[in-house]
Amino acid sequence: MKQKSWLFDFVLLGIVWGCSFIFIKLGLEFLTPAGVAFGRVFLGATTLLLIARVKNISLPKGLRTWFILWVVSLLLNVIPGFLFAYAETKVTSILAGIINACTPFATLIFIFLLSKDEKPKSFQIQGLLIGALGVGVVLGIWSGLGSGSTSGVIALFFAISCYGLSFPIIKRFLMPLNLKPESLAAGQLTSGAITLLPFFIIHGINKYDARPIAYAGMLALGIFGSGVAYIWNFRIVAAAGSAIASSVTYLTPVVAVLVGWIFLGEKITWNEPIGALIVIFGAALAQGRFKSSKQLA
């Protein structure tokens, strides 16, 4: 795939994932946090199942494989899906988007904790410390948590911790299966949708008379943010490598800040964009973006 082709997917992915936080806000106009979590996973699963059907890709087989997919869905979709939606009843979509950019730090921490072979390198420790500083600036720790809700902020950090824990598990248990990415993603989201269905039935809908834009936002969150986005991500990995694909995490907080400010009129405090830049720099450093191949070895 030529650079222009993967670059188009890269920009689309950054925009869609960056807009996910405003889509969550819109979904909360008529759904509960559990309803938002179920809606995005159900719509994403339906989208991926249709894509798999068109491409004649079969779903994974075997109880062990489905159990692993269920565990991954808990960590990537069910728990963080609920926590992000709950958090956005307390904090702005801008803050949620910025904290989400801390996911690489959580991933590194869990890799160090769970792997006996991987030891932290000096540049990774430096990146983690710089990232922690950036988070402190974003939250305005010199004045408590600024205007942020304590429970909302805690929920955000629990959510990205789930993301961080999921990646070592995926690498250890799912990657060796050598299944097609579309098959894994469809199975993962299907497991998540089944898990969340009872919570949606019990208390998933707050009201039925929401604005049309709220329904549109929920559709976009599920179909694109949790469905088609997986396909874009796989295409970028195949065409440009995982390093380029993971760089989209630097674009999403920028998009989240801009759309939250422009379309929702959310207030941006001076420390949030500055802290976000520090977080992005720390994440890039921790991922070895500024190191030569010799230094990474």
Question: Model-found features: residue ranges?
Answer:
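Membrane-interface helix-cap regions at the ends of transmembrane helices
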Residues: 19, 23-26, 30, 44-62, ...
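Helix-helix packing/entry segments at the starts of transmembrane helices
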Residues: 38-39, 96-102, 169-193, 223-262
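Hydrophobic transmembrane alpha-helices of multi-pass small-molecule transport proteins
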Residues: 48, 70, 102, 109-110, ...
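Specific transmembrane alpha-helical segments of multi-pass solute transporters/efflux pumps
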Residues: 15-16, 20-24, 49-100, 136-137, ...
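Specific alpha-helical transmembrane segments that line the substrate/conduction pathway
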Residues: 35-46, 75-76, 84-123, 242-262
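Transmembrane alpha-helical segments that form core, pore/gating elements
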Residues: 107-109, 145-203
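Juxtamembrane helix-loop-helix junctions in multi-pass membrane proteins
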Residues: 15-45, 92-95, 165-191, 205
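Juxtamembrane helix-entry segments on the extracytoplasmic side of multipass membrane proteins
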Residues: 2-6, 29-34, 38, 61-67, ...
